[in-house]
Amino acid sequence: MTALDSRNWGLTPAMETGLFQKPQDRIFIIELENSIVSFINSNTESFQLRPMNSYYRLLSHQIAEYHNLNHVLARTQDSCVILFKGENFQKIEGKPLLQELQLNKKPEECASSSESIEKSNNNRIFRILKRKEVGNECDYKIDGNTRTPNSNLTANSNKDQKIEIDDKSSTDLEQERIEKERLYEQRKQEIFDKLNKSEDDVKSTNSSGSSDSDNEWSDWLNGDDSNTQTSNGSVSSSSPFNSSVTTIQVNKPQQQFYDSRRGRGGRRRGTNNYKDAYRGQSRRNKENGGYQSGYSSPYLVYPPPQMGGNSLPTYPLMYNPAGPAPGPAPSPMVMGNNTVFMNPYMYNMNPQGSCSFGTPIPMYPPYQYQYQYQYNTQYHSGPYSNTPSYNSNNYTRSSANKYHHFQGKNSYSGAIPKRSDDSNSNKNEGIRRASVEGSPSSRDTDSVEMKFDKLNI
């Protein structure tokens, strides 16, 4: 191994560091140099190196320059270096290989020198430089057509261009940093408090508005259905609507839910029973379900206004016999000189018989449904469940009631009403007598009927 000074052979600092201070880089340099020597001794004109990082590409360029070779980057891959000999290539005789060189300094001295440089860099104190603001006002002396700057201006500009070193100590800088952080946190907290306050105000306004409406509805639903008499003797309605008479349906007719699953020949798999339209009711909300087509509601028809004799005749809605009719066929009516069929009116007619232009058309409360139902559940299974006018067999088994809503189990006799025929007529008569014996007196029944009349049902 040749012990020579590396500066005599044109070694770069990167080559010196890789050869004498970093063993991993020294291994790379030795392998690369062996490949270059084999390329020089061969007849090939170019040699492409393997892909490598930028630091090793730098060492490759410098090592190729050391051995008098030309070097370029590949066009297809920027991470590859291509070495070629060229026309004027000559092998330098007597030049040692890089792996044979050795520095005059010992490695310990090199390591100590590098450590001292690092320590000096770490101990260096950096100060914050502050540039003084330059004034915009300038003083000039104008003599004729020439302008000469004042000597004070020149001195000030020279002083402004110089960078002054801040004399603040590290403690002052730390205190300033702490103060800035405190102001930042304070400002951030104020912003968040303002946002939270605005959100709380919005929620409070929404809750107050909804609570008022909820209280109004709850008072109306939980209160008595009948009109209450005030201290002045006037009758006030508990309904939130501004109406003189309001019909309230407490117990609406039970909606019919049908099985929406696909039919397999009209039968269920694994059973011999046909589809049951009421079997799926236990899995659904019966009270607040959506609108179903099975619910039989009457047609809603607005009555045409009565016109004068000199005006054009009115053409009301005609009855379509092909359409679905929830009840019996409507009765004929004479409109003009023609006899037409009208659906039952949902609203009362104007008692005055005619209306004039410019006068608002009054609104009238609707009729009750054409099918009578038991609207009050408190009289279904209570002591007044067998009142003849509200819970008789003729009432529940009427032909007008398309969907028969059975009363369920009797609270007194424990019997379920069945279809009346010749074989069971005696049994039903006995059950009816037993229930009448357990019912209250006629006096109580009359008071109950009076309450029903007040409820306007």
From Swiss-Prot:
**What sections of the protein cross the membrane?**
none
Start-end of Polar residues biased regions: 145-158, 248-258
* Family matches, as SUPFAM superfamilies: R3H domain (SSF82708)
Molecular function terms from GO: mRNA 5'-UTR binding
**Where is this gene product found?**
Cytoplasm
One Pfam family of this chain: R3H
Q: Relay the record's extra comment.
A: Present with 892 molecules/cell in log phase SD medium.
Name listed for the protein in its UniProt record = RNA-binding suppressor of PAS kinase protein 1
